[in-house]
Swiss-Prot record:
Transmembrane segments: none annotated. Probably deamidates glutamine residues to glutamate on methyl-accepting chemotaxis receptors (MCPs), playing an important role in chemotaxis. Keywords: Chemotaxis, Hydrolase. Its EC number is 3.5.1.44. CDD domains: CheD. Belongs to the CheD family. It catalyses: L-glutaminyl-[protein] + H2O = L-glutamyl-[protein] + NH4(+). This is Probable chemoreceptor glutamine deamidase CheD. It comes from the Archaea.
């Protein structure tokens, strides 16, 4: 099965078969969208919450808000229906201890913005594994819409399928 790897501040979409994956989700978030009927899906690996807050600099996929809009547009182009899409959300970890500043709680903010934007777009969030301190790797199976998540927390490897 072909695997497409998504880097930080990037996304990929596909249809039918294959795996779309992203590695090393720390404070970043990985958002998957999937239409079970057409078997169209996509994955976004966003670094920061809102483009406007950073002066819309650079690639829109770097930000949760603009990246999600981009991902939505691309899965619809491949045949997905916005009304059937299901979202899954991963990442948003607090990677450093002793951070008190709200400004530096990027992981938490990424998760909040992702949930807000999904609500605004009318897309159902059906699964999530967010927060904590460990990094995550996720694999979206385009034939089923299932996401296999692997994380390391306190030296333990945890794998789950969502």
């Amino acid at each position: 099965m072909k695997e497409v790897k998504v880097g930080i501040g990037d996304y990929a979409v596909g249809k039918g078969n294959g795996i779309i994956s992203t590695y090393g989700l720390g404070s970043c978030v990985g958002i998957t969208l999937y239409d079970r009927v057409t078997k169209v899906g996509g994955l976004l690996h966003a670094l920061l919450p809102e483009a406007a807050r950073y002066g819309h600099r650079g690639n829109p996929a770097k930000y949760v808000d603009t990246g999600l809009q981009l991902l939505l547009k691309e899965v619809i182009k491949l045949g997905a229906s916005k009304f059937r899409l299901e979202a899954k959300l991963f990442g948003g970890a607090q990677m450093f201890d002793n951070i008190r500043s709200e400004e530096l709680k990027i992981g938490e903010k990424n998760v909040q913005v992702a949930k807000r934007e999904l609500r605004k777009l009318g897309i159902r969030l059906v699964a999530e594994d967010t927060g904590g301190k460990g990094g995550r790797t996720i694999y979206l199976d385009l034939s089923t819409g299932k996401v296999r998540m692997r994380k390391v927390t306190e030296g333990k490897v945890i794998e789950k399928v969502y």
